[in-house]
Amino acid sequence: MKPYKDQQIIIDDILNEFAYRNRIMLQLPTGAGKTAVFSFIAKRFIKDYKKKVLVLAHREELVNQTLATLRDIGVSCESIIASKKTLKHNANAYVGMIQTLKNRLRSNPLFVKEIELVICDEAHLDIFKEVFEYFPNAKILAVTATPSSLKKVNFTRCHRCKKEYDTITECCNYETY
């Protein structure tokens, strides 16, 4: 599996932005391959920085989809699920549901060590902001099709988005496959 040409441009742009910014929101339209894009970003981040990545989602099917995509592109990853009480710390990426991670972090703030990039899928949901405090030095990539629930909003001017993120990258003209 390889990214499409347009996806590769986005991947390169986001990784370049991380040299200057810590919190980035990436808006990609539905069908543009958000999971593939952020999975390739995770893979490159792991390779380039030798650091671990955490991917958070709010639904189990998104967790499973992300695990499958990361494994397909050769990333060693492990799920964070309620029934699993310990993690193999040799994985390069961890994927879990936001609520499960929040519960783990409350009881053990060191539950996930060495995380330098946190990726939030469907990041327009407010539940993700609570986790950021556990990773104050990590890069944050928030990926969504709809950064605001308001219709017809210019996302780069959305006050809530600008308050949370250093930059907002819109890919409105992105071709879907």
Language-model-detected regions and their locations in the chain:
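Conserved pre-motif I regulatory segment
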Residues: M1-Q27
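Alpha-helical elements of the RecA-like P-loop NTPase motor core of helicases
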Residues: D12, N64, N103, K129
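Walker A/P-loop
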Residues: Y20-K43, T144
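Residue-level preference for the first positions of well-ordered beta-strands
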Residues: R23-M25, K52-L54, N92-A93, L117
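Conserved Walker A/P-loop ATP-binding site and its immediately adjacent core
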Residues: T35-F40, F45-D72
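Inter-Walker segment of RecA-like/P-loop motor cores
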Residues: L70-R106
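SF2 helicase catalytic motif II
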Residues: I98-T100, S107-S149
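Interdomain hinge/linker at the junction between the two RecA-like core domains of SF2 helicases
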Residues: N154-Y177
